[in-house]
Amino acid sequence: MATPQISRKALASLLLLVAAAAAVSTASADDVLALTESTFEKEVGQDRAALVEFYAPWCGHCKKLAPEYEKLGASFKKAKSVLIAKVDCDEHKSVCSKYGVSGYPTIQWFPKGSLEPKKYEGQRTAEALAEYVNSEAATNVKIAAVPSSVVVLTPETFDSVVLDETKDVLVEFYAPWCGHCKHLAPIYEKLASVYKQDEGVVIANLDADKHTALAEKYGVSGFPTLKFFPKGNKAGEDYDGGRELDDFVKFINEKCGTSRDSKGQLTSEAGIVESLAPLVKEFLGAANDKRKEALSKMEEDVAKLTGPAAKYGKIYVNSAKKIMEKGSEYTKKESERLQRMLEKSISPSKADEFVIKKNILSTFSS
């Protein structure tokens, strides 16, 4: 049977959509060029126009703008006629002073070949900024929707997700009109992204304005309300901590036994099973002819472990076996090999696997 043919025009359109979605789904600070005192005039006022955000790291409005500006940068990444850039005014005061910056964030438009800026006065959303840049630069770039890592709950899905005894679930009950909810939204999205590789952790939300009965069931009377539903307490407990990303990450790590930083990277504690430390010490201190006995003790203890610790325990045992087989140099050589792999372009799941193994190996070299 003949295969249906796709027209070149349709294929081209499809490829453009895929490219746009891919660009925005991987939006990051790297998509916005960070300018300094020495690079500003090398990049701005040259052969392309530039939109520049002058910001301060401590500024709340700047933090709120950051994810929108990063989406803008990702969308315009391949637009050769436009530069999306930023300047840290705490570090580069002279640049900000030169261009009359007195508050943060200040967004200025520099036409091609000009260092005479025009101040942007519009809304601080990726869509509004894109519309402005398109009108000034005669471009036609669209902001594609960014896939969310937050699980959106409904009355039909709430119980199956939140009451799942194999998951630790954080739920935000929000209202679309709520100002505090809007402020929290980009932070909550980043939190979900941090833990997207952890199958046992779910970051979710529920439109409590739309699903009032469910919100009332869980005692929600203000927005946003955050409740944590751990594996052992599906009645839920109030989250009363801070609402910055670092606060949430600290809470999840403590409650769920995870070990991630605010960028989603595993920390040096990931994979470490404290109860096995004495057995590792005994193994390393044993004479070669006694190591088999020390390994047997380790295997016995690992067999009693449950959950993620059971998986990590097997890596401890395999590491000990490799040391017996290849000698003490194995730890150093394998750690160096894993580090080389981590420096390559690998999937997040592979990176997690290698970091955990490297962390566990480090316990055999101390």
Swiss-Prot record:
Q: Which PANTHER family match?
A: PROTEIN DISULFIDE-ISOMERASE C17H9.14C (PTHR45672:SF11), PROTEIN DISULFIDE-ISOMERASE C17H9.14C-RELATED (PTHR45672)
Its biological function?
A: Acts as a protein-folding catalyst that interacts with nascent polypeptides to catalyze the formation, isomerization, and reduction or oxidation of disulfide bonds. May play a role in storage protein biogenesis.
Q: Which EC numbers does the record give?
A: 5.3.4.1
Q: What is this protein called?
A: Protein disulfide isomerase-like 2-1
Q: Name one GO cellular component term.
A: endoplasmic reticulum
Quote the NCBIfam families the UniProt record gives. pdi_dom
Lineage, highest ranks first: Eukaryota, Viridiplantae, Streptophyta, Embryophyta, Tracheophyta
| Keywords tagged on the record | Disulfide bond, Isomerase, Redox-active center, Repeat, Secreted, Signal
- Give the Gene Ontology MF terms in alphabetical order: protein disulfide isomerase activity
InterPro entries in UniProt: ERp29_C, ERp29_C_sf, PDI, PDI_thioredoxin-like_dom, Thioredoxin-like_sf, Thioredoxin_CS, Thioredoxin_domain
Q: Which reaction does it catalyse?
A: Catalyzes the rearrangement of -S-S- bonds in proteins
What family name appears in the similarity comment?
A: Belongs to the protein disulfide isomerase family.
Would you say which domain of life the source belongs to? Eukaryota
Query: Which residues are connected by disulfide bridges in this protein?
Result: C59-C62, C178-C181
Q: Does the keyword Signal apply?
A: yes
Q: Where does the entry annotate site (Lowers pKa of C-terminal Cys of first active site)?
A: R124
Instruction: Please give the biological process terms from Gene Ontology that the record holds.
Output: protein folding
Listed CDD domains: ERp29c, PDI_a_ERp38
Q: Which gene encodes it?
A: PDIL2-1
- Is DNA-binding among this UniProt entry's keywords? no
Pfam families registered for this protein in UniProt: ERp29, Thioredoxin
Q: Which residues form the signal peptide?
A: 1-29
